[in-house]
Structures are given as C-alpha cells and as structure tokens.
C-alpha cells in the first residue's frame, strides 16, 4: 500500500490542561469539526468520546491517554487534508505519568488554559514536562464565556508563571456572556462563527470600532515577533516594508518549532467558538514528524553505540510502545508511535529491550474507544497492536535485522502505598492477575509482597491514583478487596562522612572456612546528584582484595540499601568508597565479602548521623477570601510551610509545602472548613529531613 497522507501533513499533538480547563470538551469539538463525531458529547452528561473508562465518565476527569485520529482541511478548506493524531492527556496531578508518557511521543502540544483560572499548578507541571522533551506548543485560552474571563490576564500569567514568551495570535471580542468571536491578528479581521450550525461556518468581518486601537497594538507585537525570526525579515520590517501573510506565518512557525515563542489563541469550546481557528493554528504552526529532530537511541551491539532514526518510510522499522491498555473486547492493546520504517500486520518484530520477538497480529487505529482495523503503519503514525505478549510501556519495537533501543522513559518513584487483601479465596488468584496487568499498563504503579506481614502492597503517586486502581480491580476484574490505611514512602540517609569503617566475616573452624574483610568510607551525596541515589567507588590498591570479589562488596551494600537500619526504609543519597581489606587464599568467597560489606555498612550507618526523610508535597489551595485564615491555620497545624498567597477573581490562592503524612483526609477537612467551596491540588515536590519527634514515632511504629 502506498502512503495516503504525506508525512509532512501529519500532526501528532497532545492536548494538555489543568483539570477543569475544559480540555475534554475542547477535544470533543475537534472531533466534531473534523467530521468524526456527528453528535457532540458533553462531559457534564458523561457522554464525552475521549473519556472511555467508566470511572472517567463518573468522575468527569480524564484518566487514560486515548489516541485518536482525525483529518482537517482548514476552517475555510484552505489546506490539503492533514492527518491529526490526538493524544488526550489527563489533567489530574496523580496521573502526571500519563502526561509524561504522552509528551515522549508527541511532536507538538496544545496547552488549554481556563480564561478565569489561568495558569494552574498542574499546568506548571505539564509545562516542565513539555520543556524536558522540547515539545513545541501553542496555547488555547478556553471558557471565554465564563464570568471573570480575561484573555490578556492569562497571556500575562503564561509569561510570569511559566517563564514563556507568549505571543497572542488573536484577541477575544467581548468576554463572559458578551463573548462573540475573535480578532485574527494576522489577517486583521474579526471572525464570527455561525451559532445555527454549531460553528461549522463563519464570516470574516471588520474589527469592531472600539477594538481597532488594541488590535493594531497587538498586531504590531505579532509582526515584531515574526521579524525576529531572521535578519532579512528584521531589515524589511525596520525599513518600513509590509511583511506578507506567508512571511509572517512562516516566521512564526519557525520560532514555535525552535521553542522561542508560544502563540496564544482563545475561544469557548462549549459555545462552539475558537476551536476551529485553533485547529488551523495546529496546522500552520505545530511540527510534522519531519520537522522534529531524529529520535536517538543506542545500537544493540554490546557497545551501546549511539544511533538515530529519521522519520522516513525507507529507514528500518523502529517504534516506541508508550501505553498498554486493557480493552474489554480484545484484551491487551499496545499503543505505539512509529519513528521510522513501516510495519504490517503479520510482521515479526524485535522487542530490543527484552531481546524477545513479537508478532504483530491485528493493528488498529483508535477513535477514542472505537477502533478501525488497518493493515500497515508508517513512519510518523500512531496505532495500537492487539495481543502483543510481553511488551511494557517504554519498550522499543524494531526490525530484527536492524536492532536499536530508543531512549527510555523515566518514571517517578511512588510516594504512597496501601495494603490490599482479597475478600475471598476466589479473589486471591484474580487479584494477582489484575494487579500484574495494571502494573504493566502503568509504570508509576508498583506491586510487591511485604516480607514481614506477607500482605500485598500497592504503591502510586497519590490517594486518587490508588483509589482508581482498586476501583478498576473491582470493575474490570471483579476482584473485591479490603484496603488498608495509606502508608508514606519514607527514605533513610546519612548526614556525616565516616572513614575507615571495618567489616569482617570470618569463620575458620575446621573444613573450608569463610573469610572476607573490607574497610570502607561512607559519605552523603547531594540529593538528586546521582540518579540511582548511590555510588560505589573501588579504590583498592595493590590487590589487597582480588578483583573478582569487588562486585560482591558492592552487591552486599546494595542489598542493605533496600531496607535501612533506621526503620527498614530504602537508603538514598549516599556513597561508598572501598579502599582496604584482606582476603584468604582458601577461605575467601563472594558470599564472605558480601557479608563483610553488610557488616561494615550497618556499623558505619549508625555513626554517620542517620536521618529519616519524608516526602514533602507542593500544595495549592483556592479558597473564598473569608476562609483564608482557617485554611492557613489548618495547613500550619499540618506542619505546612506557607510559601505565599495571591488574590484571584474567585478568592485567594494559597501556596504551601506540607509533609505527605499530614495530608491524609485533607479533602474532607477542607470541605468542612469552607462548606465545600475550596479546592486544592497536591503534587510531590522533594524529600526532606523529618523532625526528630516525627522520625522517632515512625521508627517506633516500625518496631525497630
């Protein structure tokens, strides 16, 4: 089969936003205008197409990143058809991992902001992730019809809170119930959409007289931003020459692709205004797969030789599995992005991360939860494979004759855990299967068995994250489970360097003995300086310990790091320098050196000022003004550090840093303090030393 859409006419985009910015409604409108949906699904009646898991429809929030394909030829049918693959990303902070995962496979993103709420805390998190993956983006300021809507205020927040360089592409005509359309600052025309056909048709009109001055000012700003793309354009602009529409658009596109500016559009998805022009901006300004740098990876040659793959059908096949989902009808769905080459149904490919072959059976393209079966997928496209056996999120799928491992994704460590127990014997077996499958889908979710209590422990990024896991076990796998109290994921570390700590394991009574002897230094590492949180330096001189025993010393210490001497929590941010020791020709063994290392570790840890670290959360509360004092007082009682507050249209926004252990049940307390009028968001910020009384209580509770 030949390619139906040239790769330059592809757009792989994410739509990202804070939880209530109206992202799902925006996506629905995109599907409506691109002709996919004939009836618009509204989130508030639980019918939105993209939100296809039952919990999402009940809670009105988006959990799973669904990928959908749509076609767009422009508001005035001014383009050849472009293929837009939309990855819907969740806006709730517990699902940040989903956003991170989507960012990895996108080429561009649309950031949706609420015209009233502006740049919210989750918007900042998503922004940082988009920066990390260098994703070019445009912004859509939604909900211009709401009370308190202010387009230019949000533009200013994009600048001050995100440190970005926003350039309005449009201005809003009116606001709140008087919002009627937008001014196109490139064409210098007003756009009015037709209410009778839900905004499918529109008219260009003259700019309202009372807006001409403002429009001229922002048009000038837009032209200046375009002129900065090249010296040639700047000379033309400074010489007083007019830039053509094609020059303006080309220059703005170049600057968006270089991540130098953020073009800002506006509208009200709910009122069918603005989404159409935002789609035009996606085509005009966001990259196709050939506009972004080639993907990096390493060759599977034992030497980790760097390599890259370009977005071309002629290169060997390479793809990244970015999401595993369980579909009630077909089982496992593996969403993958093809970076190079072509794959056909029936092909055998290599999972280079696991060194295992997989056969592509059926391939489908998703429209939210409907699916269309296809025979091939080409470079730049996104699809889902049914029934791959052993693929995990982040694995590379590639041509067995040209193996490559694409850059892996990094997933954060969970900060909260709970014990789950099946209610009946029948639930026991099903629970293992269910949790295994859910862990495969979501790398930020972990499952293990506690060795002491023999309980099954599940861990994730927040209370809501784990609630939904338990809920899915019940709905999708019919597993009834009792859930324990949430537990905080503490860590242990040291604050002081200790030198010449000795560890000796010697057993030499008759027969073959055991002998290992090590001398180490232990020292604290700067938090975050080493991704593993641990380093091991071998400084043995003159063979006092033979080379073959060195890995055993490292291993002995690493085993101790899993459960620290203080309270049995993982040890982080410490380094070990092995610099002396001794061995015995006959009696030394790997086991003896492993045991000697663990003895030295325990001995040194006690002397190195051990401390307990607790997770600190970044908390933002929005509350009516009259409740500010109560909310701040309550956060202080929870050992919260107040970081500032600001006035909003809807009340006061309070910024604080609070230990996770103090935040359980906060939603209920906040509701009663403010009669349900306040809301909050919380995300993991850092680990910090727990005060001694808190540490003492935790250590005693662990029975250490």
Swiss-Prot record:
Domain of life assignment: Bacteria
Pfam families referenced in this protein's UniProt entry, alphabetically: EFG_C, EFG_III, EFG_IV, GTP_EFTU, GTP_EFTU_D2
NCBIfam families for the chain: EF-G (TIGR00484), PRK12740.1-5 (NF009381), small_GTP (TIGR00231)
GO cellular component, one term: cytoplasm
GO biological process, one term: ribosome disassembly
Positions bearing N6-acetyllysine: 504, 643
Binding locations of GTP: 17-24, 88-92, 142-145
Protein source organism: Shigella flexneri
Transmembrane segments: none
Cellular localization per UniProt: Cytoplasm
Name of this chain's protein: Elongation factor G
Annotated HAMAP family: EF_G_EF_2_B (MF_00054_B)
Protein family according to the UniProt entry: Belongs to the TRAFAC class translation factor GTPase superfamily. Classic translation factor GTPase family. EF-G/EF-2 subfamily.
């Amino acid at each position: 089969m030949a390619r139906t859409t040239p790769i330059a006419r592809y757009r792989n985009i994410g739509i990202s936003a804070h939880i209530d910015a109206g992202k799902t409604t925006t996506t629905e409108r995109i599907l409506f205008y691109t002709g996919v949906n004939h009836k618009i699904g509204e989130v508030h009646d639980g019918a939105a197409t993209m939100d296809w898991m039952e919990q999402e429809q009940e809670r009105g929030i988006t959990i799973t990143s669904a990928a959908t394909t749509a076609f767009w030829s422009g508001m005035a049918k001014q383009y050849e058809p472009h293929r837009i693959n939309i990855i819907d990303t969740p806006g709730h902070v517990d699902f940040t991992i989903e956003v991170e995962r989507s960012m990895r496979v996108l080429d561009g993103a649309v950031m949706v902001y609420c015209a009233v709420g502006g740049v919210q805390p989750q918007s900042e998190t998503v922004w940082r992730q988009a920066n990390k993956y260098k994703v070019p983006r445009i912004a859509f300021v939604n909900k211009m019809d709401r009370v308190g809507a202010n387009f230019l205020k949000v533009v200013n927040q994009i600048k001050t809170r995100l440190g970005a360089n926003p350039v309005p592409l449009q201005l809003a005509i009116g606001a709140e119930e008087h919002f009627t359309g937008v001014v196109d600052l490139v064409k210098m025309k007003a756009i009015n959409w037709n209410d009778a056909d839900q905004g499918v048709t529109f008219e260009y009109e003259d700019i309202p007289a009372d807006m001409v001055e403002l429009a001229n000012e922002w048009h000038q700003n837009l032209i200046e931003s375009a002129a900065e793309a090249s010296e040639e354009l700047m000379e033309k602009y400074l010489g007083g020459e007019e830039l053509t529409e094609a020059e303006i658009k080309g220059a703005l596109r170049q600057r968006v692709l270089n991540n130098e500016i953020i073009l800002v559009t506006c509208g009200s998805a709910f009122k069918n205004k603005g989404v159409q022009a935002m789609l035009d901006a996606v085509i005009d300004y966001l990259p196709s797969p050939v506009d972004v740098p080639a993907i990096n990876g390493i060759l599977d040659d034992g030497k980790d030789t760097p390599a890259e793959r370009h977005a071309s059908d002629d290169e060997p096949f390479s793809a990244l599995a970015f999401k595993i989902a369980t579909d009630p009808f077909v089982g496992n769905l593996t969403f993958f992005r093809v970076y190079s080459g072509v794959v056909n149904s029936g092909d055998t490919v290599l999972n280079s991360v696991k060194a295992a072959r997989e056969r592509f059976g059926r391939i489908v393209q998703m429209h939210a939860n409907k699916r269309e079966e296809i025979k091939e997928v080409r470079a730049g496209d996104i699809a889902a494979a049914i029934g791959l056996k052993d693929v995990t999120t982040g694995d590379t799928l590639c041509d067995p004759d040209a193996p490559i491992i694409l850059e892996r994704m990094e997933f954060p460590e969970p900060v909260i855990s709970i014990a789950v127990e099946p209610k009946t014997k029948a639930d026991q077996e099903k629970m293992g299967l269910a949790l295994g499958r859910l862990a495969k889908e979501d790398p930020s979710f972990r499952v293990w068995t506690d060795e002491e209590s023999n309980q099954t422990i599940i861990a994730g990024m927040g209370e809501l994250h784990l609630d939904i896991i338990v809920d899915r076990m019940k709905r999708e796998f019919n597993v009834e489970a009792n859930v324990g109290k949430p537990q905080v994921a503490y860590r242990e570390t040291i604050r002081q360097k200790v030198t010449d700590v000795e560890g000796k394991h010697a057993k030499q009574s008759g027969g073959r003995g055991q002998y290992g002897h090590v001398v180490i230094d232990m020292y604290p590492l700067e938090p975050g300086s080493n991704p593993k949180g641990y380093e091991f330096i071998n400084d043995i001189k003159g063979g006092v310990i033979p080379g073959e025993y060195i890995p055993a010393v490292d291993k002995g210490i690493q085993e101790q790091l899993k459960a620290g001497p203080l309270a049995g929590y993982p040890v982080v941010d410490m380094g070990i320098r092995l610099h002396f020791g001794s061995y015995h020709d006959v009696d030394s063994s790997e086991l003896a050196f492993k045991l000697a290392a663990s003895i030295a570790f325990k001995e040194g840890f006690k002397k190195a000022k051990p401390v307990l670290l607790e997770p600190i959360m970044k908390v933002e509360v929005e509350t009516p003004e009259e409740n500010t004092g109560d909310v701040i007082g309550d956060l202080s009682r929870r050992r919260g550090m107040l970081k500032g507050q600001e006035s909003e249209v809807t009340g006061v926004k309070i910024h604080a840093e609070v230990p996770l252990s103090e935040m359980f049940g906060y939603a209920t307390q906040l509701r009663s303090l403010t009669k349900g009028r306040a809301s909050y968001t919380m995300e993991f910020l850092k680990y910090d030393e727990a005060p001694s009384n808190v540490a003492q209580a935790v250590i005693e509770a662990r029975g250490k």
